[in-house]
Amino acid sequence: MKTMKRVKTVATRLSDFGKWYTDICLKAELIAYSEAKGFIIYLPYGYALWENIQKHLNCTLQKTGHQNVYFPLVFPEKLFHKEKEHIQGFSPEAAMITTTGKKNLSEKLVIRPTSEILFSQYYSKTITSYRDLPKLYNQWCNVVRWEKTTKPFLRGKEFLWQEGHTVHATEQEAMQQTLSILDIYQKLGKDLLALPFVCGKKTETEKFAGALITYSIEALMHDGQALQAGTSHYLGIIFAKSFQIQFQDCDNQKKYAHQTSWGVSTRLIGALIMVHSDDEGLVLPPYVAPMQIVIIPLQTQDESVKQVSENLFSILQKNYRVHLDLQDKTAGWKFSQYELKGVPLRIEIGKRGLENDEVTIFQRYNFAKQNIKIKDFPSQIPQLFETMHNNMYQKALQHLEQNRKQATTYEEFKTYLKQGGYVAMSISGTDAELQIKQETGATARVILETNLITANCPVTNKKALQTVLFARAY
């Protein structure tokens, strides 16, 4: 048997959380760095995670009547200036194409940072009657935003996402769409990713550039920092006025259409890593894992062990994403490798176990090992996966709830903030929010639909108007 180098370990979360995170991204072979700074290569294992998210969300959106489309990567710069608030929000990050070969372009082309402009321009040409509504379009694509500081999956100059763009006849219909998408995202987190989210409305300073209202899903990472994992925006008739998206209603009146836009991105993969993983490497929930089960024969040269392994693989691959590892490497090396890659379930097959018609199963998320009869094993997998997924969700939910506090004074707020997690406080408005951000680095995550904690704002001593959840965030 070949002598193999031991699988490289990752940094610990307590010693260096940032290095621990990038170690997992690189050593679990999710990504590689490219030659262009701020751009990553999605390796097969990492891209498969995104594909599984796509499949799940596509299935849901098809049931709700949404259709997938693809719009161009670029649009003329002149369109960028049609909606002032939108351009103010995105122009600092917008990348432009100015030359082709040695020639300057007669008109600069903007590489999409988001696609509200492209969709609005199209809708203005194609929507004329109430019979054309609603339009429920979704796009899977890449976008480019020239970020100064980058981190794999969380913040990059290019990232992958889905962006929905819908058009409706009334405000009520558009708002219903905005909130229903928020529910879909929350369900995606719970059912596929085992991620609990805090959901709510964004403050005026944190809302999307060009939106009337923004809602977001927020996840809490293991280090106590928040991560905005997705957003859903009610755009009102702002873009409709800028791009003249009008329709003839059933009463023969010309009206502006109401729009929404919404999206989740590969940030969800970053959230998966930071919430579930441990000091041994990646930990993945079973339903999203690219490789759900790995079968490891302990004696690869033994014919009976090999035969049972191949038979079991043949049975399991009909319903699961399963891999049979027949490489000429030590079992210990393989164990470490698949633990690093976060494979939810490992099956160890050896001569001693076969004497009792048993295999050993290992669950990655809690390191539990048990022997089980070969004939009983396939029928028990659904329950194993369900328990595994639910336990991972509950663990993440417990972490979120234990790190969610409320403050009645500014000093108490600062103390809680240093401990990490979410801190709720009733504030007077934007003035208090900006002061908090400047003095503590915490940002408003969502507005809570709860009673005021205090009558006056602890920061400004003015009358408190709303209770806001704050955190330091990625």
Swiss-Prot record:
Q: What is its main location?
A: cytoplasm
Give EC number(s), comma-separated.
6.1.1.15
| Localization | Cytoplasm
Q: What GO cellular component is one of the record's annotations?
A: cytoplasm
Q: Which domain of life is it from?
A: Bacteria
**Sorted UniProt keywords:** Aminoacyl-tRNA synthetase, ATP-binding, Cytoplasm, Ligase, Nucleotide-binding, Protein biosynthesis
State the Gene Ontology terms under molecular function: ATP binding; proline-tRNA ligase activity
- State the reactions this protein catalyses: tRNA(Pro) + L-proline + ATP = L-prolyl-tRNA(Pro) + AMP + diphosphate
Which GO BP terms apply? prolyl-tRNA aminoacylation
Q: Which Pfam families match?
A: HGTP_anticodon, ProRS-C_1, tRNA-synt_2b
- SUPFAM superfamilies, per database record: C-terminal domain of ProRS, Class II aaRS ABD-related, Class II aaRS and biotin synthetases
State whether keyword Transport applies: no
Comment text on domains: Consists of three domains: the N-terminal catalytic domain, the anticodon-binding domain and the C-terminal extension.
**PANTHER family from the entry?**
BIFUNCTIONAL GLUTAMATE_PROLINE--TRNA LIGASE, PROLYL-TRNA SYNTHETASE
Q: Which family does it belong to?
A: Belongs to the class-II aminoacyl-tRNA synthetase family. ProS type 3 subfamily.
NCBIfam families from the UniProt entry: proS_fam_I (TIGR00408)
Tell me, in a sentence or two, what this protein's role is: Catalyzes the attachment of proline to tRNA(Pro) in a two-step reaction: proline is first activated by ATP to form Pro-AMP and then transferred to the acceptor end of tRNA(Pro).
- Describe the subunit structure: Homodimer.
Q: What is this protein called?
A: Proline--tRNA ligase
Organism, scientific name: Aster yellows witches'-broom phytoplasma (strain AYWB)
Query: Taxonomically, what lineage is the organism?
Result: Bacteria, Bacillati, Mycoplasmatota, Mollicutes, Acholeplasmatales
